[in-house]
């Protein structure tokens, strides 16, 4: 495709922290370009998933193509790729940015710059994108435009003099944003090859069409009837339909260079179009694949088990379909003595885990139990081999273990100065070591090295509570570091429950063992016999609590009479309880597995 035909295409995405008004701004842009009639408009048009709507966050990247007639009289085609703002979904952001030439940095004029937008903005600048600052929510009485501009310059380091001040809610100045997109974001550049190269931004499964992929065509064109090849797998597929979202699905005769749209090549296998891969023509392939974004490594692992064992094949199929749409999800089969067959799943963080579980339960009608999440440790065995360890119950015997290393992350926290003391106290409690503190205008940037196990579970919630919601967090993995770790096992009536094992720092083992026993005592229902709950490190019991037995009053029917009769009945009851204890299984409720999560709170 010639550079002339690409001159009027603008591919952009919006970078913003959670709740800074990104989806609302997208709604206004769609409305102004006439993508949907006024009666079809609904809040957060692009957040199509019901969970996104309820939580008010964007999880999946979405795309929309809009024609816009600018003030210079020319018609431009704007391809907007929506991105999530939460730290767990940063891989969705890096993928969307790889398909763009520019980005709008949306900052809430009342709250100022937040950590997640800083991280995503750096990703955009590294990929060579033109970043246009937009100050949103200027209709709020607390909005301070000059302060927000100064913060963008101090914290992110890009020029904010020409920042566009808008209110997405009222629609004020949205036309200026569109003009800025047209004049400041460059058109797609022609590549050095004229052979087809298209980046897969996202894929999802449609019950009628099979796999539908969202692609950005870098060079060449895709038409229905052409035979395409997936470069990493070498598989070929025949294209059935191509088109764009306006945001409704609209079919086209071809997708040309610089355009973003969907293609359907009746791929039935969910792994047929891996996200981040390159598509090319089978007859005339491109010499090399596009530089994809880096593959995200899952950081949190948990077991997912169906409550009803017959649902196991359905769970596998549901995870397969979700994986297509969620490139960061990993899973492999696992069996547990306590829970039966299920899957060990890897997630990017706790929010990601909650959302995957919620989607499985809602969209696929599954009833699931999840085990306590754990991070990946590195275990150096005495024979010199290093094994990654994402499941505490699989830890080798301690006499075979030389050392256990835990993942350490670098956390960057942005906060108003008033809360610095509270945040430092929180980080020290979590075994953190301080790297530095920078005062940037009205914000303070605090850098810490923290163990990932401490951050993953509830650090985010605690950070919000000690800073009254003002602090924001971004983190990335640094290295593995040796530490004194032990595995705390939970025994119920002498039987080890593998799903309740946790790996903890030795100094916390006694306290965690005690808390776990107390919590389990509250949650395990009373049986006809005493239930002993014990926490153990190796063969040493560190804590115990007992759920007392329920007693039936066997003497109720004895009115008076000889005492030996009563003794006989009590002895008989005792014998029965003894026998029951030998054969009785204790049912452990789902809340008990989640108790491991809530212990720190």
UniProtKB/Swiss-Prot annotation:
UniProt keyword Endoplasmic reticulum, yes or no: no
Annotated positions binding GTP: 19-24, 136-139
Molecular function as annotated in GO: GTP binding; GTPase activity; guanosine tetraphosphate binding; ribosome binding; translation elongation factor activity
SMART domains: EFG_C
Lipid bilayer topology: Peripheral membrane protein
Keywords per UniProt: Cell inner membrane, Cell membrane, GTP-binding, Hydrolase, Membrane, Nucleotide-binding, Protein biosynthesis
HAMAP family: LepA
Listed name of the protein: Elongation factor 4
Organism: Xanthomonas campestris pv. campestris (strain ATCC 33913 / DSM 3586 / NCPPB 528 / LMG 568 / P 25)
Lineage of source species: Bacteria, Pseudomonadati, Pseudomonadota, Gammaproteobacteria, Lysobacterales
